[in-house]
Regions:
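Conserved short alpha-helical segments that host acidic/polar catalytic motifs at enzyme active sites
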Residues: 1-192
Length: 192
């Protein structure tokens, strides 16, 4: 079964203690996100069931990101599902494939980053988290990623203040944006 701790104040004040307690379980639960503005929900299955299961139609907020995935770099599991959150109040979804994710992963591990999956999208999320933790803005971190990440990709990265979209320089994966008075919508496939 799943047990959830839904006290943001507890998680913020006693984060290390929570991690220690969680690691003592035989099958430890995972923290999917931290922070006070963004909540992450992951599941494998049909999107309609996922929306109904978590009652997304009852949510309020300034922005939301959903992702339907065709796995190319890792297994189809709940932990491998998008979005990936590797920093406080930020998350990433990704369409494409990073060809240098293993070398970037090794460098991040040398810098002390810990990974939960073998997913190339998690590597991108950790890369951006590290860049923003060093003081870069989301825009600057995304711009630097064009020099450091190889492959074909489109990223959508959300923070508590908004979101950014980035395509690789070759632009193999679509980035379709629609803007009305009520919303801005994005898709990384034309039929979306």
């Amino acid at each position: 079964g799943l047990d959830f701790i839904k006290s943001k104040e507890f998680l913020k004040e006693d984060y290390e203690k929570v991690l220690e307690v969680l690691s003592s379980f035989q099958n430890p639960p995972r923290i999917l996100s931290e922070g006070s503005k963004i909540e992450i929900f992951k599941e494998v299955g049909p999107p309609k069931e996922f929306v109904d299961q978590f009652k997304f139609h009852d949510f309020e907020g300034t922005h939301g990101i959903g992702h339907t995935r065709m796995a190319t770099e890792s297994a189809v599991t709940t932990m491998g599902a998008h979005p990936f959150s590797t920093g406080s109040d930020q998350c990433l979804v990704h369409n494409g494939s990073l060809s240098n994710h293993n070398s970037v992963r090794r460098k991040l591990i040398q810098d002390g980053v810990q990974f939960e999956t073998n997913n190339d999208s998690e590597v991108a999320a950790c890369y951006l988290t590290q860049k923003m933790s060093s003081g870069l803005t989301l825009r600057s971190a995304l711009t630097e990623s064009l020099d450091d990440l190889d492959g074909f990709f489109t990223f959508v990265v959300a923070t508590s203040k908004g979101f950014g979209v980035l395509r690789d320089r070759i632009a193999c994966k679509p980035a379709v944006l629609a803007e009305t008075k009520e919303y801005v919508a994005f898709g990384s496939e034309y039929r979306a």
